[in-house]
Amino acid sequence: MNCEAVVQHLVTWLREKVEEAGARGVVIGVSGGVDSAVAAVLAQKAFPENCMALVLPCESSTEDLIHNRLLLDKFNIPYRVIELDNVYQLLITQLESYIKLDGSKRRLLRANLKPRLRMTTLYYSAQARGYLVLGTTNKSEITVGYSTKHGDSGVDLQILGDLLKREVLELANYLHIPSVIINKTPSGGLWAGQTDEEEMGISYEQLDDYIEYNRGEPGVIERIANL
């Protein structure tokens, strides 16, 4: 992949889309992962003066918060930290006072509430500034629907939407994203110990091979079809 050409194309594309919408810049939520890191750096290249990153902790790990700070300081990306833990706990208390659920279903409902709270916060910030909300979901995730409806999928633009996970990693190396972010296990941070690949039941390498080359072991193909 010609990373220089891809970066130039995505930066130009983002500027054009924001201009077409009559907006002034972009707001992006950063998670401490490689996808949001790459998207944030591209956004800053497109809008050096009109790019705002939001760090939105909601039962987030200390590691993710450290990695966010490492990225944002390295690339001088303006950011704000908005703690969502109290709002999240209040909603959980209110909702579960009349809906009694146990086990994995309750865990999933609680987990999906987090990106939906972040979506609401991102749009408040974007509307206040006349900006668009920039997403961080890659092509691999979009292909199998690995996102939260009206959560991390609730954005105006998906700058990584045509890039496989392996291509995002290639861009991350080209852009000199901190290696600790590139090499960390992909996770949505939905609950302690959660990982993307464990939840999907396949690796990103297997998924990308299927998308790019239409190949894979029968069990992998069946798993992808059922996602």
Task: Report residues per predicted region.
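Catalytic subdomain that performs nucleotidyl-dependent activation
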Residues: 73, 110-114, 118, 132-205
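Intrinsic disorder and flexible/low-complexity segments
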Residues: 216-227
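Generic alpha-helical structural context detector
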Residues: 89, 93, 148, 170-173, ...
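ATP-dependent adenylation/nucleotidyltransferase module used to activate substrates
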Residues: 1-144
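Short alpha-helical "packing" element that flanks the helix-turn-helix/winged-helix DNA-binding module
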Residues: 206-215
